[in-house]
Amino acid sequence: MSLTYMNMFMAFTISLLGLLLYRSHMMSSLLCLEGMMLSLFVMMTMVILNTHLTLASMIPIILLVFAACEAALGLSLLVMVSTTYGMDYVQNLNLLQC
């Protein structure tokens, strides 16, 4: 495994750990999700370019489209929760809360 692959895998792992450990605020969760998507995009692009897979060259672009949709939905949810409750805690997303 080359150094670049190892760095991308570590970036994905650190983002996943950040998502699991710092999940009280929604903004930090969204940033960790974006870090995971960015490392996946770079890793998939490197694998496709190194293996010369021409049929799978659209997969990283599709991943970027899903990442943009995820970011837009996450930011709109962040704005909605922060205007409704005045803070960006993830625990405010519970619909069963009285």
Swiss-Prot record:
Database matches in InterPro entries: NADH_UbQ_OxRdtase_chain4L/K (IPR001133), NUOK/Mnh_C1-like (IPR039428)
Residue intervals passing through the bilayer: 1-21, 29-49, 61-81
A cellular component term, taken from the record's GO annotations: respiratory chain complex I
GO terms of biological process kind: ATP synthesis coupled electron transport
Protein name from the UniProt record: NADH-ubiquinone oxidoreductase chain 4L
Primary gene name: MT-ND4L
Keywords of the record: Electron transport, Membrane, Mitochondrion, Mitochondrion inner membrane, NAD, Respiratory chain, Translocase, Transmembrane, Transmembrane helix, Transport, Ubiquinone
Entries under PANTHER family matching the protein: NADH-UBIQUINONE OXIDOREDUCTASE CHAIN 4L (PTHR11434:SF0), NADH-UBIQUINONE OXIDOREDUCTASE SUBUNIT ND4L (PTHR11434)
Compartments reported by the entry: Mitochondrion inner membrane
Reactions catalysed: a ubiquinone + NADH + 5 H(+)(in) = a ubiquinol + NAD(+) + 4 H(+)(out)
Origin species: Platyrrhinus helleri
Function: Core subunit of the mitochondrial membrane respiratory chain NADH dehydrogenase (Complex I) which catalyzes electron transfer from NADH through the respiratory chain, using ubiquinone as an electron acceptor. Part of the enzyme membrane arm which is embedded in the lipid bilayer and involved in proton translocation.
